[in-house]
């Protein structure tokens, strides 16, 4: 069991399964609900 998803992990934009702190689910393409966890730019 993993509580959060790391960089490069597959994610769903509208999902309870979220990327780790400092990461976000970057869409594969605009309007997609699927993506990959990527580092946030602050």
UniProtKB/Swiss-Prot annotation:
Role of this protein: Exhibits stronger antimicrobial activity against the Gram-positive bacteria (S.aureus (IC(50) is 7.4 ug/ml)) and fungi (C.albicans (IC(50) is 3.0 ug/ml) and P.pastoris (IC(50) is 0.1 ug/ml)) than Gram-negative bacteria (E.coli no inhibition at 100 ug/ml). Binds to chitin (4.3 uM are required to obtain 50% of binding). Does not cause hemolysis on sheep erythrocytes. Has no blocking activity on the P-type calcium channel.
Disulfide bonds: 4-20, 11-25, 19-37
GO biological process, alphabetically ordered: defense response to bacterium; defense response to fungus; killing of cells of another organism
Keyword tags: Antibiotic, Antimicrobial, Disulfide bond, Fungicide, Knottin, Secreted
Species the sequence originates in: Tachypleus tridentatus
UniProt-annotated location(s): Secreted
Pfam family, one: Tachystatin_B
Chief localisation class: secreted
The name this protein goes by in its record: Tachystatin-B1
Matching InterPro entries: Tachystatin_B
Expression sites by tissue: Granular hemocytes, small secretory granules.
Free-text domain note: The presence of a 'disulfide through disulfide knot' structurally defines this protein as a knottin.
An annotated GO cellular component: extracellular region
């Amino acid at each position: 069991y993993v509580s959060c998803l790391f960089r490069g992990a597959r994610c769903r934009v509208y999902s309870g399964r979220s990327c780790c702190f400092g990461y976000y689910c970057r869409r594969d393409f605009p309007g997609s609900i699927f993506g990959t966890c990527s580092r946030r730019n602050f």
